[in-house]
Structures are given as structure tokens and as C-alpha cells.
Amino acid sequence: STVANAMGPSWIDPRSGEIINASVTVFHNIVQLVQYWRFLQTAPADEEVRDVVLREDLLGDCIAYVLSHEVGHTLSLMHNMAGSSSIPVESLRDPKFTQEFGTTYSIMDYARNNYIAQPGDKERGVRLTPPELGAYDYYAIAWLYTPIFEAKTAEEEIPILDKWISEKSGDVKYRYGKQQFRRRFDPSSVEEDLGDDPVKASEYGRRNLQYLLKHINDWVADKDCLLYTSDAAD
């Protein structure tokens, strides 16, 4: 298939909330898509991805991210486009922060790879990829599926569930931002962005694209890479 996508559909009984059936569908060309993402977003900072074919272990990490995201959908998690919007941009160049949190607090965000990291950052220990699971994801799954044995009815669960929400309400790691379609009214809930300052983040991204355009022929000139070079130019 030439489709570059994956899905995590599920069938849910509206009477009980029980997930009756769920599956993860992965189209073949997702392999090419995740390679594009990794190359175009992180090649300036990562010598290991400066090729048209990713090393198997690196490609496996990229696919694992996609699969984890889709499994999240099968478990009823919606897109959380606020996953990275509360992270200070400079924290995404900080080794300690990125090793703990990656690029986002939720893999249900569209926060792919760390395009803010600059050449030399990886050598300092900066992580360039999303987390396996984010703080929000662990919390959301716990909220959805932790048994509340003291509650005898669904109605009795509500105060406890509300309490769990209140306990995290002041912590930006657990913020949720609904995906916006057609019109964007909330700048903190946007696809494909990183960090809390879009101007600063875009400036770092621009520097990386300039670096990539300057060196791309040195990295892949002897390969069949028309798509890579044209995407970089676009």
C-alpha cells in the first residue's frame, strides 16, 4: 500500500463502556513516513539518521511510537494536542529533561521528534524522540481503568474520579487539549508543534532546516533520494 498511516479503531458498547473489539491497522508505507520524519526533523543533530534508510533499531523505535499511539486510541484515548505546549522550549535542549520526558507529556500528541535540538545537543545527552509513554498517558489510563472497589454503582465512582482530576488540575503535565479541525482557536493545542513558545521553537527549526539544506547532498547525494531532497526544499 502507498498509504502512509496507521489507525487504532475500536467498537465500544455504549451501555457499559466495554471495549468489545479493537485492532491496530498499519499501512505499509508508514515505514517511509517515519523515516522522513526522523531524517528531516533530527538529521542536523543526529549523524546516525543521515541516510535514506534508517538503521533497523532506529526504525523500530519510530514504528514503536506509532504503534503505541494507535494502541492508545484502541483504549479510548483521544488526541491530546496540548501534550508539548507547556514545555519550555529550552527544556527540549536539556539532557536531564528530555531523558525523562522526551518531546511531550503525551504520545497522543502529534509531537514527533525533537526538531528544536541543535547540532551537538545529542552528544550532550539530549533525547531526540518521544517518550515510550508520557506522564499524561499513564494518568489517563489509570483514570480510565483503575478499579474503584468501594463504589457499588457507576454514580458512586463519580466523586472519586472527580477527585483524581482535581489532584492533577494544577500540573501542566496532565493538561489535555482537544484536536482542532478546520479552524484553530487555541494556539496551545496545535498539531506538530513543540514547546511553549512557537516563535522560538520555529527559529530553532529554521536553523536546522538551513543546516540540512547545506549538507543534504553530502549525506545522501549518492543515494536514490529525490523525495528526501525535494521534501527538504519544500
List each language-model region with its residue ranges:
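Acidic, metal/ion-coordinating pockets
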Residues: 81
